[in-house]
């Protein structure tokens, strides 16, 4: 984690320059600008890359991902062993031996920036409101990142697991700081402490005009997400209700249109000449995603550098192909044509910017889904189904949506979880698989199966087919930490057990 104690404000780092005049307060473009004002603190936070982290786990490690043998064989060079196939098959040695883990590094970069803001807050000039906003954002960002790290690198929360390994709780700026992992209970205690501090300094009740600035609505929504992950459904429901009081309106997907002109591709020895029908969001950059998609409570993305999120048949089959606009616009038929070397016809999941991003941020839809699931699990199953009626109306072609129905609580839970899966695939599925494994209801358990090939860290052995079976209860869902980080810590960071 090579980090600096100064804001590096080269021209390329200036975030969203056309969006708001708040950038007039940003320090000069020279490098090594010290943090001396509250505006400097907010500039650290507003830096655009703070809004996303690279995440191959989200793209490839769940049952939402699909890389059939035939797809791989059509173009092996498209599927990197370390950054695609190892994550796809949960191949431990391959993940450990990656040259860098971008999710781990990006999250600790965000944590470092939060620590810089917190440690500098008593020494800067500016109004108390500006300082409070900076502190609220910093504590929130740190809590968000610690929870993200816990989701991917720790065992799921339960009374049994609370003594398992947590994540390094870096709270200062010193490189000599203790980086031992502590326990999962200690990690969550820090997350809750940071959220409490964020709320104490919050100056916005609802989502502000700069949507990534923190509000009490966002704090409540993150509490709801965390308590859902912990299986504390009464608490999650309470915070979801608080968040919904100030949440933005649902984004009506009937507002979306097709990109025009459509991307055109010439004929090849495998593909005919074609135009791909893609949603207008295929052409949305980060700026448009942040501002045009008005449902954000707190925007955040999982970046997929490969731009290859290929959905499984089971995921595709969850949708109404005729009327569900999530399927119509985001699952691109013949989408593998986008990668010219792949000679295998399949869908490509592409919600944003030519498949560069998956949603990982807080939205009104997610909070409604949290509320509905908690209602059902707490016995209020008719109310839980009704909670999702507005969401389905906003996601289906006009006048075609229907209310979810069930005959009992078990059926209602299945309906709500399937709706959650349709709305929040890939990124959210990872955490869901883990938490389902520790609920008292075994009906939600998931096992991921891969029919692929035997692998080493340098080679895919196409002469040796192999089936990988990863139950949700497997300890391997606490993903291994890459070896460079273990080595650089001189053993202070303990590796996850097999």
How does the language model describe each region?
Residues 19-67, 316-322, 399-400, 442-498:
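Membrane-proximal, proline-rich intrinsically disordered regions
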Residues 48-56, 230-231, 237-364, 411-447, ...:
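Extended ligand-binding clefts on enzyme/binding-domain cores
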Residues 80-153, 182, 195, 199-207, ...:
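Conserved, well-structured interaction surfaces
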Residues 111-114, 188, 195, 240, ...:
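Inward-facing hydrophobic residues that define packing positions of alpha-helical scaffold repeats
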């Amino acid at each position: 984690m090579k980090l600096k104690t100064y804001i590096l404000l080269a021209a390329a780092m200036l975030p969203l320059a056309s969006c708001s005049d708040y950038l007039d307060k940003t320090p000069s473009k020279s490098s090594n600008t010290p943090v001396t004002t509250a505006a400097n603190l907010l500039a650290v936070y507003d830096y655009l890359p703070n809004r996303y982290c690279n995440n191959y786990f989200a793209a490839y490690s769940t049952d939402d991902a699909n890389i059939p043998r035939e797809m791989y064989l059509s173009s092996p060079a498209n599927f990197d062993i370390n950054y695609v196939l190892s994550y796809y098959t949960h191949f431990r040695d391959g993940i450990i031996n990656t040259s860098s883990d971008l999710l781990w590094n990006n999250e600790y970069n965000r944590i470092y920036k939060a620590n810089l803001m917190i440690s500098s807050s008593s020494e800067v000039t500016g109004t108390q409101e500006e300082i409070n906003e900076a502190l609220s954002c910093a504590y929130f960002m740190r809590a968000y990142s610690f929870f993200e790290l816990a989701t991917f690198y720790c065992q799921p929360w339960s009374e049994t697991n609370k003594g398992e390994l947590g994540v390094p709780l870096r709270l200062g700026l010193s490189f000599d700081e203790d980086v031992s992992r502590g326990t999962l209970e200690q990690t969550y205690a820090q997350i809750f402490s940071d959220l409490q501090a964020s709320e104490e300094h919050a100056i916005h009740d609802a989502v502000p005009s700069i949507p990534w600035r923190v509000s009490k609505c966002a704090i409540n929504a993150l509490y709801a997400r965390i308590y859902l992950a912990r299986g504390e459904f009464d608490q999650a429901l309470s915070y979801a209700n608080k968040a919904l009081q100030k949440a933005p309106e649902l984004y009506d997907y009937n507002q979306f249109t097709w990109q025009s002109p459509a991307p055109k591709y010439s004929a090849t020895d495998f593909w005919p000449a074609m135009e791909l029908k893609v949603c207008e969001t295929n052409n949305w950059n980060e700026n448009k995603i942040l501002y045009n998609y008005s449902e954000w409570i707190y925007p955040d993305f999982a970046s997929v550098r490969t731009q290859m999120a290929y959905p499984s048949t089971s995921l595709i089959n969850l949708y109404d192909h005729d009327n569900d606009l999530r399927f119509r616009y985001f699952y691109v038929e013949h989408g593998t044509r986008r990668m010219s070397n792949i000679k295998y016809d399949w869908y490509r999941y592409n919600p944003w910017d030519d498949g560069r991003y998956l949603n990982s941020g807080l939205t009104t839809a997610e909070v409604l889904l949290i509320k509905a699931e908690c209602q059902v699990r707490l016995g209020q199953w008719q109310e839980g189904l009704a909670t999702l009626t507005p969401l389905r109306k906003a996601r289906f072609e006009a006048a075609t949506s229907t209310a979810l129905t069930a005959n009992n609580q078990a059926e209602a839970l299945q309906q709500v979880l399937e709706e959650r899966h349709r709305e929040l695939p890939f990124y959210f599925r990872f955490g869901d698989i883990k938490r389902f494994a520790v609920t008292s209801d075994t009906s939600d358990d998931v096992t991921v199966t891969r029919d692929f090939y035997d692998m080493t860290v340098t080679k895919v052995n196409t002469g040796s087919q192999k089936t990988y079976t990863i139950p949700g209860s497997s300890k391997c869902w606490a993903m291994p930490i890459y070896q460079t980080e273990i080595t650089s810590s001189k053993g202070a960071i303990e590796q996850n057990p097999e």
